[in-house]
Structure formats: C-alpha cells, structure tokens
Curated annotation (Swiss-Prot):
Swiss-Prot/TrEMBL GO biological process terms: tRNA methylation; tRNA wobble uridine modification
Recorded family membership: Belongs to the TRAFAC class TrmE-Era-EngA-EngB-Septin-like GTPase superfamily. TrmE GTPase family.
Broad enzyme group: hydrolase
Cofactors: K(+)
Matches recorded under Pfam families: MMR_HSR1, MnmE_helical, TrmE_N
Compartment(s) where it occurs, according to its Swiss-Prot or TrEMBL record: Cytoplasm
Protein name: tRNA modification GTPase MnmE
Species lineage: Bacteria, Pseudomonadati, Pseudomonadota, Gammaproteobacteria, Chromatiales
Keyword Nucleotide-binding: yes
EC identifiers of the protein: 3.6.-.-
GO MF, any single term: metal ion binding
Domain TrmE-type G: 230-392
Amino acid sequence: MVHTASGREVRHGLEDDDADTICAMATPSGQGGVAVVRVSGSRALEVAEEVAGPLPAPREAGLRRFRDARGETLDHGLVLVFPGPGSYTGEDVVELQGHGSPAAVTAVLEALCAAGARPAGPGEFSERAFLNGRLDLTQAEAVASLIEAETDGARRAALRALSGAFGQRVDGLADRMIDLRALIEAFLDFPEDEDVPADPPELAAEIEALGSELAEIRRRAAAGVRFGEGIRVALVGPPNAGKSSLLNVLSGEEAAIVSAQAGTTRDVVRQWAALGSRHAELLDTAGLRDAEAQDEIEAEGARRARAAASEADLLLVVIEAGKTLDEELRARIAEQAPRPVVVIVNKIDASGDEAGWEGESEVGAHVRRARVSAHTGAGIEALRRGLAALVDREAGEDAWAARHRHIEALDRAGEELEEALVVARRGGQEELVAEALRRAQTALGEITGRVSHEALLGRIFSGFCIGKE
C-alpha cells in the first residue's frame, strides 16, 4: 500500500476508497472563451450526470445545460465522456466544456463537489494515469514538460519523452541487467551443472556494453534537462566594448544600462531570450581590465564576471573593432573548451569593417567569430542565426525531456556499473557483481516507476499544476 502525493491510499493502481472521484479546471485560470472542467474516478459518470443531465455516447460531444442541485442553470456547453480504462487516467473521465468565466467555472466545480466529487490535488490526474498503468513516470513528467515548454526544441523533447521512448530505453537497459544477473546467479547456484556456463561469458565486456548504453541515455537526458532549464550565455570583455548593448539587442529588452562611460556595469545583469530552439539566460558582466585600473567595487564586478564565464554553456567574448584579444580573454577562451565560444567584434560602424558571421576562428576549434554593430544593427541577424545554429547543435535533435532526478538516478546506476566492472575484471567474486547490478537496476527503476517510493511520488506529482496534469 502507498500513500500518494494527494494523500490517498492505493494498492496495485486501484484506490482503497473506490468512491474517490476528483474534479478540477483543466484550462488556465482567468477569463477566456472556453474553460474545461475535468472529472475522473469511479463515480465520474454519476457525478457529471447530476450536473449535466444525461451524458452523450462515449467520445461524442453533446450540448448540455449545467445545473446545481436546486436545478438552477450555471452555464451551458459541451460534454465529452471517456470511459476507463481507455482514458487518460485509466478511469472514467468526463469533460465539461463551458464558458471561460471564473464565476461560471467556480459554480460548476462547486456543483460537482456537491454531487460527490472532491477537488483534485496537484498533478493528481497524471498521478492516477501512472498508478493505473497508463503512463510511466517519465511520460507523466513529460506532460508537465510539454505544458511548460517555451521553445520549439523543448516541445519536441517533451513529445519524445511522452511517446515513451525515454522510459522504454531505460527499462530495456534494466532488463539487460536482469538477464546478466540471472546468468551470474545461475552460475553461483549451480556451478557444476553442465547446462549453466562455468563462467559468465565475457562478463566484463557485457558490463562495459551496459555502461555504453547508460552513457548514451544520460547524454540525451542531460540535453533534455538543459532544454527545460535553459542555457547560460555569458557576455564578457573589456569595459565599454558594448556588452550591455548586445544583451539588450539579443533579448529585445532594455535590461542593461548603456553608457559611453566605461565600467557602467558593476554586477551581473540577467535577461532571458530565445536562441534557436533553446531558452537562454543572458548574463551581462562587468568589464575585465588590469587590476591596477580597478577600484574595489569594479574588482568585485570583475570577479563575478569571471565566475559567470566559468559556468557558462556558451561564452560571448565582446571586443571593439580594431582591438585584439588580451591575454586574459585568450585564457578564458581556452578554459571554455570544448564548450562553444563566439568572439564578437562590435562597433564596426566606427571602423568600417564588414558585418558577418565566420564559421571558424584561428583561436580554437570551439571558437566562432562575428562582426556586428549593436548600434546600427548591422550583422545582428547573422549573429542570431549563428548563435541559434550553435545552440541547436549542442542540444542535439534526440534529447528527451528530463529532470534532475533522472540524471541523479542514472549517475547512481553508472557508479554501480563501474564497481561491477572493477570486480568482474578482478574475478572470483561474481556475487558482488550481481549485487552491484541489482543496485544499478533499482536506480533505473526509480526513473520509470518500476521501483517507486512514497516520498518519490510525492515529490514528483506535488510540483505539477492542478487539473492540467
């Protein structure tokens, strides 16, 4: 028996209290043309009929008046019925589609609760879909990721995970671990049986193959985490090179103060923008120059600029046209490898240089170069296209929407495989190999829900929206 995030007790996907029926608004709150109220549970049909009257045939829309227990009309709209177990939650589901008036929605929800439903908790519809076997945990979380997606890349990554591809890959790897464990344990239990190999065949090679598959899964999941969080893009360079102007141009907002006076930016200024298929946090930093020329506040700003550069997924080094990279900037560029760097030559309107984007730079293979004028806009569109291509290439086209908990579980599985490999190469302690494989398999099971704990489910579903998931 498990106490779920909503506080219910469930066993094998079925509620102990069979009469527990939930309702919630499934569309965003506030005024709108249409609002959808969703009802799910063993009494969903009965409860909905109390409010909407005779229900239409399954999956056929019917126009109905919504009434309270006194018969007063609350609203009118369409009703759709989705019988379980073929519904989203695996239970009987009814949707009432009325007008997007907050007062009308509240009245309908109150009438449904008076008829026997209760308000749904955060993520409870997806939670029930998981408990009833309609979704694994990666798919349930992908629903939330799809709702939260702000870029096309994040949308695509969420749909890949929602299709079940992420969970199927993880479960497939776990099954391979089970098979290898079974082989090892058969050898340990029946060492003299001629039908059982005297030694697990190429045990170390088998574990290495599992590790390679795990690394590929982690790569795609880590890319998906970055889709959800966005990437950090730091703008660094000497004072008065035009970093703040570029941040404002790229973000479309006057987020940073622009002045002809050098050293205007003293702290890190943060602004979000879309770069290609990714959401990016642009970090405008204080100018970097010789320590002797800095006061105490400017020195602290430079320290923060260096910290931002070291943590950036993409580094934009901004210099004035006619100037060269100094020793510190060259060091920063070298330290950034293999993460991408773009050297942006700004203020070409004053130098007469031609605007453009260069695919390569003599500074390093991970470095690109652009020539722009933040003042006139020359070269800015080419810069946007170049940055978008860089960002999309780094993200890849095969990412799955993923969460930090997935990465943590994959890393734990990886540590167990490394331990198993060390023991396997040493030989003679196959039982320790089998135990390490079991722990790795358990870690993978937490990703899809094959292995689930009360605290894990509570943490996952409590972060979802009410009604939408």
